[in-house]
Amino acid sequence: MSAAAGPKVAFFASPAFALPVLEALRAEFEVVLVVAQPDKPVGRGLKLTPPPVAARAAELGLPLAQPHKLRGNADFAAQLRDSGADVAVTCAYGKILPAGVLEIPRFGFLNTHTSLLPRYRGAAPIQWALIRGETVTGTTIMQTDEGMDTGPVLLQEELPIRPEWTSVELSAALSEQAAALIVRALRTLETLTPQPQDEAQATHAPLLVKEDGFVRWADPAQAVLDRFRGVAAWPQTTAFFGGKRLKLAGLTLGQGKGQPGKVLQVGAGGLTVACGEGAVCIATVQPEAKKAQPAQVWAQGQNVEQGARFDLWEPPQG
């Protein structure tokens, strides 16, 4: 299909995750407008930096808008209307779309969501699918309404989750899947039948907070490992030992059992720590304000031996 033969597309997105989707769209259709979040201060120098999608759009010479707000923004509404977009596609854009904007394109807005809706509605579906131990996830193409991922479903495709994947690898796989699926949806846009979501099956995937990365040693070892996989990109896995905060990496299932948080073994293969059921092996430890180091080196430097115990942390109740 030539770009001229398909619908004209406005693309609303910001992070690097959405770049394969942008490339797929511009290869198949005419992208008449890219809409991204405003530039933000980054790094120690707080240099204003465009989000990855905005930077790529500028490189490609695509029309670009970065409005600070959408609701009540007559100038932006006019820009979207004047672009001639037949349909708009959103992919991790990061802003709720008001009704006045949703109504502008002739075919409305389509959202690429990285879960099998209605499961894992919200900002962090990839991370929570891993934390909850899912073995299959996928991508949904849905019509956007004013709710949070509540619109009718147009297309879905499953993706098996490999046991070694963290949120980094799963994000990359879903990004490519989303790129292919949105092209398929746009090619057949006028023949797709929207299917309402089953509200009774809805689950939620809220934005992660730092505490989501804290190890719950009382959990089964598999749950500790699944949490590690889910928070690998951010906030990463954090544990406490003697009141001091540590970042943990290279977690795998270990051998043995004991009191949650108890060190079962210190060796060249890492640090084996008991969980509520089973144990995990930790390859790398990073103390606060220090470089990451092999767990055995850290243990020797801190005189951590078999029988020592990590601090227990539990999420506050209520």
UniProtKB/Swiss-Prot annotation:
One of its GO terms (molecular function) is methionyl-tRNA formyltransferase activity. Belongs to the Fmt family. The gene is fmt. Keywords: Protein biosynthesis, Transferase. One of its GO terms (biological process) is conversion of methionyl-tRNA to N-formyl-methionyl-tRNA. GO terms for cellular component: cytosol. CDD domains: FMT_core_Met-tRNA-FMT_N (cd08646), Met_tRNA_FMT_C (cd08704). It catalyses: L-methionyl-tRNA(fMet) + (6R)-10-formyltetrahydrofolate = N-formyl-L-methionyl-tRNA(fMet) + (6S)-5,6,7,8-tetrahydrofolate + H(+). InterPro entries: Fmt (IPR005794), Formyl_trans_C (IPR005793), Formyl_transf_N (IPR002376), Formyl_transf_N_sf (IPR036477), Formyl_transferase-like_C_sf (IPR011034), GART_AS (IPR001555), Met-tRNA-FMT_C (IPR044135), Met-tRNA-FMT_N (IPR041711). This is Methionyl-tRNA formyltransferase. (6S)-5,6,7,8-tetrahydrofolate binds at S115, L116, L117, P118. Attaches a formyl group to the free amino group of methionyl-tRNA(fMet). The formyl group appears to play a dual role in the initiator identity of N-formylmethionyl-tRNA by promoting its recognition by IF2 and preventing the misappropriation of this tRNA by the elongation apparatus. The keyword Transferase applies. Its EC number is 2.1.2.9. It comes from the Bacteria. Pfam families: Formyl_trans_C (PF02911), Formyl_trans_N (PF00551).
